[in-house]
């Protein structure tokens, strides 16, 4: 019919055109087909802002330029370099993954999303990103940003906390992929960029969106209603008591550190001794110890708000505390929880 408007180009075509003109192009892990760098960036970017990741990524690449160097490193080296980035299970899996790439695949990352998922710490979306960016595989990423873009565009109001609904969304994501596998790197980056810069959780900029013309959520006037996920972890609060025990003389001071259990808060990290009560901390000290209480610290974990009370004591280097651990002067080179590293740095200043 004369004068009828043409249907919009495919979702993929519009996204590709937008990404090439308006997407992000200057990030340090872009412009490479090296799966080591892509994998490292994808793991770091989980639950962490781009601005925070850039410095850590640069330091990791400088220290461990390839997967062989990372695999050969000690756990303490890896955890120390990761310290402050949070979600420390990522660092443990990162190290284990590097070693498995060396042992199982001869130092070469597998070239398919299916095989990539057999490695520690690589889930379906991370595997899809590596396979798409490095090997042009038509694999669909489905991280938080992408779920938001797709559920809004498709008007998918199903509860993504239900596994069957998440699988159905993945199938719809596969149907939207570009036909040409060579377009997969730009398409995948475009989805990430759109979710991060335009289709944001709050106040999305629909006027800048390349796929707004047929976006269901925009037509409904309620984009912030998507995605739907009813099962959410509730935040909790916890108070902990830390022991900052240092040897004399202060100028060459060592501190008493323990190794945290494999599970729980700060799992596997070196740490100041942690107690559940003030009295339990005091009971671990020699009767002659003079305690100075530092100002309490607030520290937020993923779904827990911590209040940290720190007791500072000075003891002879020959002292042995009735708790696990040892005197360490090399704490700057160890993987420590961020609030404890800050405490030690402040006491050394």
Language-model features and meaning:
Residues 7, 13-207, 211-220, 224, ...:
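Catalytic cores of DNA base-excision repair glycosylases
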């Amino acid at each position: 019919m004369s004068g009828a408007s043409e249907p919009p180009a495919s979702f993929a075509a519009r996204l590709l055109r937008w990404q090439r003109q308006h997407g992000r192009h200057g990030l340090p892990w872009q412009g490479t087909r090296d799966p080591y760098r892509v994998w490292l960036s994808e793991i770091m970017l989980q639950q962490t802002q781009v601005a925070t990741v850039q410095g850590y990524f640069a330091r990791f690449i400088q220290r461990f330029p390839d997967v062989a160097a990372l695999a050969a490193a000690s756990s303490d080296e890896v955890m120390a370099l990761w310290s402050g980035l949070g979600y420390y299970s990522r660092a443990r899996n990162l190290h284990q993954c590097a070693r498995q790439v060396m042992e199982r695949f001869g130092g070469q990352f597998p070239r398919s999303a299916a095989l990539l998922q057999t490695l520690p710490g690589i889930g379906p979306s991370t595997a899809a990103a590596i396979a798409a960016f490095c090997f042009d595989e038509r694999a669909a990423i489905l991280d938080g940003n992408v779920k938001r873009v797709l559920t809004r565009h498709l008007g998918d109001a199903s509860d993504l906390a239900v596994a069957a609904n998440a699988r159905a969304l993945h199938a719809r994501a596969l149907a939207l992929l570009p036909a040409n596998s060579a377009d997969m790197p730009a398409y995948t980056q475009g989805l990430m960029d759109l979710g991060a810069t335009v289709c944001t959780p709050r106040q999305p900029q629909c006027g800048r969106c390349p796929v707004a013309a047929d976006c269901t959520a925009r037509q409904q006037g309620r984009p912030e209603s998507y995605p739907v996920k009813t099962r959410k972890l509730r935040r909790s609060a916890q108070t902990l008591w830390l022991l900052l025990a240092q040897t004399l003389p202060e100028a060459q001071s060592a501190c008493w550190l323990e190794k945290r259990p494999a599970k729980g808060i700060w799992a596997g990290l070196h740490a100041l001794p942690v107690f559940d009560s003030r009295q339990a901390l005091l009971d671990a000290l020699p009767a002659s110890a003079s305690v100075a209480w530092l100002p309490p610290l607030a520290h937020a974990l993923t779904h827990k708000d911590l209040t940290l009370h720190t007791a500072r004591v000075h003891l002879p280097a020959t002292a042995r505390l009735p708790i696990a651990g040892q005197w360490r002067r090399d704490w700057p080179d160890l993987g420590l929880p961020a609030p404890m590293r800050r405490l030690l740095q402040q006491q050394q200043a």
